[in-house]
A protein has these predicted regions:
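Active-site hotspot residues in diverse enzymes, especially metal/ion-binding acidic/histidine motifs
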Residues: 2-380
Length: 380
């Protein structure tokens, strides 16, 4: 692109000298008017001294002109002679306006280096060859698969960054070839391991044997995301945030994403819709059919819905703790999962809250964890 050259800007003293000539004044005359000696005035006329706000007011009175005129002369001259702006300022500002760059640096996903390398790092992170192909900053499409567009319209920039980190980690994993039949058969075993929090670490291993990669990545601030099903290199992977750090939420999100895998949702698009559990309660959000199907599968997996409905009808409005424990034993699931399902139905989220304790730490033995002061090396 051809560089434009701006016209030179004379120092303000040049105009003052011209004004003196137009009025047939001598420099000593102006010095007298301003109440200063000629040696004090000389640096101003030769551009060696600046027009201060006080001097701009005085010159305005001397020449019967607005003080702003002289102040603007000085401002234009200063701007013209300012040091060239670091081109990295615009580069960093453009990326920061679109993506949580500082958080990405903090998490170790990109390096804090000179701006000239920022474009390259971001293209490499998103797997693009041109900045223009990256959504939110260029014209790249977030939705390569039209059938899923309604859900992708809710995808935010922090969510988009997060799911790419999930994919980058998943690409480093080696698992068995994906087996739909194997995954379906493993559901009962996965559910059995939900009864004891100490057994949760076994679930990622079961998924790996079925050819499904499991990745745990802490959500970025404001991302509002619970999980996603991605297909890097055509092999399924499940990414989760454990945003709510509760067993009922973990079980629900896990089974929800497994259903996406079993159905092949997003396989042609690299990733299925990012999932925010609870978004289905928003009447203004249109959810695709595959999301409703995954919701039903997740709910049935957690607690058989007919049995749950019968239990709630029989015991309402006063469901005792002992009733819940007995029912959870009967359906062979941890009480926290039953309580979570009833809380969702009744909207009473403080009910038996003591059972909703954290589960995230039970998964930290899994190698493929990023966040919570842990960094998974994916290369830059």
């Amino acid at each position: 692109m051809r560089h434009l050259r701006t016209a030179p800007v004379e120092h303000p003293g040049t105009f003052i000298v011209e004004e003196l000539e137009a009025r047939n004044w001598q420099q000593v005359d102006l010095a007298y008017i301003l109440g200063m000696s000629p040696p004090q005035l000389s640096p101003l006329l030769t551009g060696k001294a600046r027009i201060t706000p006080d001097l701009a007011v005085a010159l305005g009175h001397a020449f019967d002109m607005p003080a702003e005129f002289f102040a603007n002369l000085q401002k234009l001259y200063d701007l013209h002679n300012a040091k060239p702006v670091d081109p990295g300022v615009r580069t960093r500002a453009s990326w920061l306006a679109a993506f949580p760059v500082r958080e990405m640096i903090k998490r170790g996903w990109i390096e804090d280096t000179e701006a000239s390398l920022l474009d390259l790092q971001m293209m490499r992170f998103f797997g693009k060859n041109r900045v223009e192909d990256i959504p939110f900053i260029g014209s790249g499409e977030i939705v390569p698969h039209a059938a899923l567009k309604a859900s992708y319209e809710r995808t935010t920039a922090p969510q988009y960054v997060w799911l790419h980190q999930v994919m980058k980690i998943a690409e480093t994993m080696t698992v068995a070839p994906y087996s739909e039949g194997g995954l379906t058969s493993a559901l009962k075993q996965i559910r059995a391991h939900l009864r004891d929090k100490d057994d949760l670490i076994r679930i990622p291993e079961i998924l790996a044997r079925c050819g499904v990669r499991f990745v745990l990545v802490e959500a970025l601030p404001g991302a509002r995301i619970d999980g996603v099903c991605v297909w890097p290199n055509g092999q399924p992977a499940i990414g989760m945030t454990t945003r709510w750090d509760r067993l009922d939420n973990f079980a629900y999100v896990l089974r929800h994403e497994i259903e996406h895998v079993l159905r092949g949702d997003g396989r042609e698009a690299s990733f299925a819709p990012v999932d925010e559990i609870g978004a289905e309660d928003d009447p203004d959000v249109a959810r695709p059919e595959e999301e409703a199907i995954a919701d039903r599968a997740a709910a049935e997996f957690c607690v058989p819905q007919r049995q749950l409905e019968s239990f709630v009808l029989r015991k309402s409005p006063f469901i005792s703790e002992q009733d819940v424990l007995a029912f959870a034993s009967r359906v062979e699931i941890h009480p926290a999962v039953v309580i979570g399902q009833i809380q969702r139905r009744t909207k009473k989220y403080n009910w038996l809250r003591k059972y909703q304790t954290g589960i995230r730490q039970y998964l930290f033995e899994w190698k493929y964890v990023d966040g919570w002061s842990r960094r998974y090396p994916t290369g830059l």
